[in-house]
């Protein structure tokens, strides 16, 4: 009887040891970077007041007419870009503010007076340039790049007076450059526009263009390095016309 008890205890210890070893192996597997983590080019950083998405090393395009589906695994960030002119039931490129380039095709949108400029991405370049530079727009289109028009928030390190009234408090977002890097930057909380600009300048932003915001227009999403998608602001209408797509 005593011998049988000893054998039983030995068997129990062996099973426990094997089980413990299996758990260690499972843990190691969980810590192995996923395919998304290995190829995740966007970097996300936060400050006290800002969320900064570094998209310097990412591929960019401008989606028009239909917002990319949140299930598209290769999309790591999708946010509204240029202003939409009118709330229409059907899509028209002429309802997007200013010249814009989507999938390498140049379209002319509606015109609006003010301090507007263009952000473009092509051939691994990301650049801001003044509205009216037709040669540059055609260069971007020939290279199958992307571009959209928006108003200056910061130009050459100085705050810019926006052409639209921005006295109310809300979430604000811009596309920006500093120290050779390109970012999409959003306020963490509802703030005044002047405070948002102040935060950007304190972070050393040199140039920045506004991105369409406001209730419903700010609906967007991003995907973290594990592949999980997160909705940024709820969807309240179907009138948005164009989105910056980051892959």
Q: What do the predicted segments below correspond to?
A:
Residues 91-110, 166, 177, 181-190, ...:
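Conserved, well-ordered active-site substructure
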Residues 20-111, 185:
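Zymogen propeptides
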Residues 15-17:
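C-terminal motif of bacterial Sec signal peptides marking the signal peptidase cleavage site
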Residues 149-179:
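Conserved beta-alpha junction segments in alpha/beta enzyme cores
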Residues 83-84, 214-216:
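Catalytic metal-binding/acid-base residues of hydrolase active sites
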Residues 88-161:
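Active-site-adjacent helix-turn-beta-strand microarchitecture at beta-sheet edges
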Residues 4-13:
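Sec-dependent N-terminal signal peptides
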Residues 114-116, 169-174, 240-241:
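Short glycine-rich loop/turn motifs
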């Amino acid at each position: 009887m005593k011998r049988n008890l000893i054998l039983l205890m030995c068997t129990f210890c062996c099973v426990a040891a094997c089980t413990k070893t299996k758990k260690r192996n499972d843990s190691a597997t969980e810590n192995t970077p996923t395919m998304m983590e290995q190829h995740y080019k966007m970097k996300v950083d936060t400050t006290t007041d800002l969320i900064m998405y570094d998209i310097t090393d990412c591929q960019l395009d401008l989606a028009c007419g239909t917002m990319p589906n949140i299930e598209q695994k290769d999309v790591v960030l999708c946010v509204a870009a240029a202003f939409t002119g009118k709330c229409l039931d059907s899509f028209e490129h002429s309802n997007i503010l200013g010249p814009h380039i989507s999938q390498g095709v140049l379209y002319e949108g509606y015109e609006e007076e003010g301090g507007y400029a263009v952000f473009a991405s092509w051939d691994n370049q990301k650049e801001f340039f003044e509205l009216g530079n037709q040669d540059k727009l055609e260069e971007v289109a020939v290279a199958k790049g992307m571009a959209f028009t928006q108003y200056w928030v910061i130009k050459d390190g100085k705050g810019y007076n926006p052409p639209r009234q921005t006295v109310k408090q809300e979430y604000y977002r811009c596309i920006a450059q500093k120290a050779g890097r390109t970012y999409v930057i959003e306020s963490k909380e509802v703030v005044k526009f002047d405070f948002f600009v102040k935060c950007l300048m304190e972070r050393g932003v040199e140039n920045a263009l506004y991105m369409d915001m406001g209730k419903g227009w700010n609906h967007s999403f991003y995907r973290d390095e594990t592949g999980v998608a997160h909705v940024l602001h709820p969807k309240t209408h179907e009138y948005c016309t164009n989105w910056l797509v980051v892959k």
